[in-house]
Amino acid sequence: MSDWLDAVKWDAQGLVPAIAQDAASGEILMVAWMNREALEETARTGRGVYFSRSRHKLWRKGEESGHVQTVSEIRLDCDNDVILLKIEQLGGIACHTGRRSCFFHKLTTDDRGHADWVATEPVLKNPDEIYRR
């Protein structure tokens, strides 16, 4: 493996969190996990590749949906334990729910102090149409 991969502080499962940020707007679109293979492939191909913890395999973003992420820059945080990908989100949808961003729930508080999560971003495309379920 390359020295640059050894600089990353991988967790006990060999993973590191990765933030996908729109390179133009700065908007955070999603957070996922990467293993060494995913990070290496991302750097090599310029496409967002992650590790699916539920499926235990590489997840090439957009492979099923067509919503590919083109990576323009890869950064490592000051503690070497978080990756930041500056990306262009092709198709404008990063979330499997059919929204632009996975961060569509906003904590709101009513007049009585009751807090709740409210979906604030529209569904751009029905997930059933995206994934042909």
Curated annotation (Swiss-Prot):
Pathway: Amino-acid biosynthesis; L-histidine biosynthesis; L-histidine from 5-phospho-alpha-D-ribose 1-diphosphate: step 3/9. Zn(2+) binds at C78, C95, C102. InterPro entries: PRA-CH, PRib_AMP_CycHydrolase_dom, PRib_AMP_CycHydrolase_sf. Its cofactor is Mg(2+); Zn(2+). It is found in: Cytoplasm. GO terms for molecular function: magnesium ion binding; phosphoribosyl-AMP cyclohydrolase activity; zinc ion binding. Mg(2+) binds at D77, D79, D81. It catalyses: 1-(5-phospho-beta-D-ribosyl)-5'-AMP + H2O = 1-(5-phospho-beta-D-ribosyl)-5-[(5-phospho-beta-D-ribosylamino)methylideneamino]imidazole-4-carboxamide. It is an enzyme of class 3 (hydrolase). Keywords: Amino-acid biosynthesis, Cytoplasm, Histidine biosynthesis, Hydrolase, Magnesium, Metal-binding, Zinc. Disulfide bonds: none annotated. Its EC number is 3.5.4.19. Belongs to the PRA-CH family. Catalyzes the hydrolysis of the adenine ring of phosphoribosyl-AMP. NCBIfam families: PRK00051.1 (NF000768). This is Phosphoribosyl-AMP cyclohydrolase. It comes from Thiobacillus denitrificans (strain ATCC 25259 / T1). The gene is hisI.
